[in-house]
């Protein structure tokens, strides 16, 4: 299992770095109420109202620390980057133009992760969204007007905002 996780991490890192995204690396952190790098390099911790743990390293890189001790590092802070209170997933807000990247990530992450996609429905109807999706496994309209979709592949050309909920893999 450790070998599989390591292989997935390697493939993910290579794929993501090859398409010039903000994503830099996944690093191992000890999570015990603060952000402490296991290699004792400079890092700090902040907690937000969304129960998110934001990891800062050398004041240059930022990311999220999970309860499992995984820190996702970005060279720029994404528009929205939150972690659940129990640390089992992150929610990332992306522009739909980044869909190519999302497809690459999902093709790798779907091996061991659960992915939920959230679309803001301000100027779109559901009938415009559902036919553009492949392998749709669940679609629910929330009280706040968002369409929640659980899918295995995405083919979208709609100019909307995207919430991506990824269940994290603990790299032990």
Swiss-Prot record:
It is found in: Secreted. One of its GO terms (cellular component) is extracellular region. It holds the Pfam family CfaA_B_C. It comes from the Eukaryota. Residues 1-21 form the signal peptide. Glycans are attached at residues 37, 153. Transmembrane segments: none annotated. Keywords: Glycoprotein, Secreted, Signal. This is Counting factor-associated protein B. It comes from Dictyostelium discoideum (Social amoeba). The lineage of its organism: Eukaryota, Amoebozoa, Evosea, Eumycetozoa, Dictyostelia. The gene is cfaB.
């Amino acid at each position: 299992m450790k070998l599989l996780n390591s292989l997935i991490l390697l493939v993910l890192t290579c794929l993501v770095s090859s398409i010039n995204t903000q994503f830099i690396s996944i690093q191992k952190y000890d999570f015990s109420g603060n952000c402490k790098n296991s290699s004792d390099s400079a890092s700090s911790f902040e907690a937000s109202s969304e129960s998110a743990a934001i990891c800062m390293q050398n004041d240059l890189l930022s990311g999220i620390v999970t309860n499992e001790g995984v820190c996702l590092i970005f060279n720029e802070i994404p528009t929205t980057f939150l972690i659940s209170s129990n640390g089992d997933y992150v929610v990332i807000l992306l522009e739909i133009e980044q869909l190519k990247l999302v497809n690459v990530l999902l093709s790798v992450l779907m091996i061991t992760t659960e992915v939920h996609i959230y679309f803001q429905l301000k100027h779109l109807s559901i009938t415009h969204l559902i036919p553009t999706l492949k392998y749709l496994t669940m679609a629910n309209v929330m009280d706040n007007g968002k369409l929640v979709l659980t899918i295995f592949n995405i083919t979208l050309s709609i100019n909307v905002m995207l919430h991506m909920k990824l269940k994290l893999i603990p790299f032990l």
